[in-house]
Amino acid sequence: MADADDIQPIVCDNGTGMVKAGFAGDDAPRAVFPSVVGRPRHHGVMVGMNQKDAYVGDEAQSKRGILTLKYPIEHGVVSNWDDMEKIWHHTFYNELRIAPEEHPVLLTEAPLNPKANREKMTQIMFETFNSPAMYVAIQAVLSLYASGRTTGIVLDSGDGVSHTVPIYEGFSLPHAILRLDLAGRDLTDYLMKILTERGYMFTTTAEREIVRDIKEKLSFVAVDYEQEMETSKTSSSIEKNYELPDGQVITIGAERFRCPEVLFQPSFVGMEAAGIHETTYNSIMKCDVDIRKDLYGNIVLSGGTTMFSGIADRMSKEITALAPSSMKIKVVAPPERKYSVWIGGSILASLSTFQQMWISKAEYDEAGPGIVHRKCF
């Protein structure tokens, strides 16, 4: 593709909770907004208030009191394509303000994404948005690129799903990828539940967003959970205040670390799954014995749900306990890990060697949506 040289590719990382979009070569996404589509709950009664039938992203968030909010991506996989199309449309035209038919677009997908999903993404890009070229990359692999490594194991935990993805010399090892349907949204729900025990009622979709904010601002991971619980019983040093939008102030104590503890003890939310530390270990154990040392020494955290302070120390402690005693364990938590998938995409799409990897519109017209399995791996 000769004409791709002068035009900046678009990188769009569609997460369950947030869309991160921008231009290849930039060091951060230009647009970050919630992956949410809101539809009015009531009929408009004011004449001349040109009400829309759907709102996307921040606008949906700000009007959340009168809307029903829907998330088209569940557990990292697109479940509602009409809403997803609205989100992409909003991304291109309102956030980035570009014509999608003029820019190649790099999309991201969850590991172990169903084949039909990839094809549908490809089809929408070429047929609805008329993209000149596109590519679909696996999220965790991009995070590893962003950390400057080609070998390591990525624990990518977002709003809807967590994955452990071992990567050796740039190739993900699909047989060893593990998926854990436990992520940020479950933590928010759990925090809603344990705040109820304190007498604070949060129930609606709009109130869930408030709890998400409490979680992001006040939660942390305890290095030693039992000890932290004991301390919190006797002292109030851990208590913090949070002001709700209506001015009411609530106090939150042990909930601060009980919430992210779910990542290490999924039984708290009734899940019979291994925690993120054990899942990471199990993933490493599914790999060839010769590469395990390289994986143990390069455990890379990525995604918004790894932003809790204390999480890297706790991971390190837990994995050291599971691994052989002589093994050197290194957990890397890059400061920009909230956006490392996007940053990796930005790096990848601007590499000169990547330019022959794009699927062009001509190739798509010739081969159909199935081309995505041949060209993107």
Curated annotation (Swiss-Prot):
Main localization of the protein described in the UniProt heading: cytoplasm
Entries under InterPro entries matching the protein: Actin, Actin/actin-like_CS, Actin_CS, ATPase_NBD
Taxonomic superkingdom: Eukaryota
Family (UniProt): Belongs to the actin family.
Activity-regulation annotation: Subject to negative translational control in pollen.
MF terms in GO: ATP binding; copper ion binding; hydrolase activity; mRNA binding
GO cellular component, one term: nucleus
Lineage, broadest ranks: Eukaryota, Viridiplantae, Streptophyta, Embryophyta, Tracheophyta
Main function: Actins are highly conserved proteins that are involved in various types of cell motility and are ubiquitously expressed in all eukaryotic cells. Essential component of cell cytoskeleton; plays an important role in cytoplasmic streaming, cell shape determination, cell division, organelle movement and extension growth. This is considered as one of the vegetative actins.
Record field: catalytic activity: ATP + H2O = ADP + phosphate + H(+)
Keyword presence, Cytoplasm: yes
EC annotation from Swiss-Prot or TrEMBL: 3.6.4.-
Assembly information from the UniProt record: Polymerization of globular actin (G-actin) leads to a structural filament (F-actin) in the form of a two-stranded helix. The binding of profilin to monomeric G-actin cause the sequestration of actin into profilactin complexes, and prevents the polymerization.
Modified residues (N-acetylalanine): 2
Tissues expressing the protein: Strongly expressed in nearly all vegetative tissues, and levels remain high in older tissues. Little or no expression is detected in mature pollen sacs, ovules, embryos or seeds.
Protein name according to UniProt: Actin-8
